[in-house]
Every structure is written in structure tokens, then in C-alpha cells.
């Protein structure tokens, strides 16, 4: 999986550079988020602007990351959702769980 990470203060931004977040690659994202949390970072921002498709495995990894962050008194926030991905969040009502922003800059301002 093509991921780029960028530390911004105490916050880690993960840029997901894949068109799909599904059963074939979601475990890699989960492992990366777990590594980041284990190093002591509490807040992660996921930039999903390149992701055009997400399945239940991808959503499950995001929920797992959200729970992991919450356990550490941190947060997992999302930005850059494309229309199809946003529709999946609305269909599953996960848009009520996550803080979702249009852009990285908008999300960074929320911290």
C-alpha cells in the first residue's frame, strides 16, 4: 500500500495514495496506524482524497483506528472524501462517528 506520513506538531497526517481501500490492502493501513499510536502519537488525520472505493474491510480498519485513538484520548479524523466514499459513510451512518473535513488544511485548523 502506498502511504505517505507527515508529522505536523503532535499530529500525524497519513496520505493514502491508493484508489481502493479494501480487503486487499486495509491491513497495511491498520498496521501503520497501530505503529503510530504505539510510538505515542494520539492524533491521526487520514487524507483519503485519492481513494475512490472503500469496502467493509476498509471501513472496519477506520473504525478500529477510531477506537484505538479514543482509548488513548486522541482522535482519528478524515478528510478529502470523494463522493462514492462519502456515500458509503452516509449509508453506514459512520459520518456521524468521524470528524470529516474537505481538506487537510481545514482539518488541521480543527486541532
Task: Name what the model sees in each region.
Residues 8, 49, 105:
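Conserved catalytic submotifs in the C-terminal HATPase_c
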Residues 1-14:
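Short beta-strand/loop segment at the start of cytosolic alpha/beta domains
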Residues 83, 105-106:
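Acidic phosphotransfer microenvironment of two-component signaling modules
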Residues 99-103:
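Short acidic-hydrophobic, aromatic-tinged amphipathic segments that line or gate anion-handling sites
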Residues 16-18:
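Flexible glycine-/small-residue-rich
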Residues 20-97:
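Amphipathic alpha-helical interaction surfaces in cytosolic regulatory modules
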